[in-house]
């Protein structure tokens, strides 16, 4: 995660390249521009993290329809949280970040669930936002949000520099953690969809080899639930 955080950062690579530029005049100009952008980026992420937390991610522009827009806003909040924590971790730990495997692993978990939740939302809209798929979409979102907050919470509670961890907690979770795992009622709705033939299950298995033959247990289970 540490190497990826540097390579994917919108400003760090520009700062590093400017520092290595043999032309001192051009280097100072480029570095000042990148540093100013980096500072603005950090302040923006800190403000967005706090604002989304205290407002419950209910405000701000977001794509999607009335059903999915709150999910997109939640992803925007967690993306700001990840960017803020990554920036602070790189600033204070530097090259030691890649040796802090628990911290980098938890931040990597946040990134993974952001990708997965974003992919689920994109597929939902690409397929025309079918009504029958909403329980599957909701379960995926609530599960990812819960996993993201669990990883963020663990990273903050165990941050190597404790006062910094407390300060970050005040920005990321000023009102405490709110995301809960999918409840039993939603679990039952999803289970019912998966255990009976329907269009939602057909879409979920689209492109998957489901022929019920000897060496394909997935196909055999699908035939049992037909």
Language model feature labels by segment:
Residues 1-226:
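Flavin-dependent oxidoreductase catalytic core characteristic
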């Amino acid at each position: 995660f540490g190497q990826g955080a540097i390579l994917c950062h919108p400003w760090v690579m520009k700062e590093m390249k400017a520092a290595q530029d043999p032309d001192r005049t051009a280097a100072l100009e480029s570095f000042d521009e990148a540093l100013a952008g980096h500072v603005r980026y950090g302040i923006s992420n800190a403000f967005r993290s706090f604002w989304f937390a205290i407002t419950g991610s209910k405000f701000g522009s977001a794509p999607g329809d009335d059903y999915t827009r709150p999910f997109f806003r939640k992803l925007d909040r967690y993306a700001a949280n990840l960017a803020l924590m990554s920036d602070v971790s790189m600033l204070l730990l530097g090259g030691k970040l890649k040796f802090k495997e628990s911290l980098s692993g938890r931040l990597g978990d946040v990134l993974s669930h952001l990708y997965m939740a974003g992919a689920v939302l994109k597929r939902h809209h690409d397929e025309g936002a079918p009504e029958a798929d909403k329980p599957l979409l909701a379960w995926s979102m609530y599960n990812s949000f819960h996993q993201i907050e669990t990883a963020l919470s663990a990273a903050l509670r165990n941050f190597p520099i404790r006062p910094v961890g407390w300060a970050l907690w005040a920005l990321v979770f000023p009102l405490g953690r709110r995301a809960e795992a999918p409840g039993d009622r939603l679990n039952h709705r999803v289970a019912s969809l998966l255990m009976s033939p329907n269009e939602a299950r057909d879409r979920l298995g689209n492109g998957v080899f489901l022929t019920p033959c000897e060496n394909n247990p997935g196909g055999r289970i699908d035939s049992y639930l037909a």
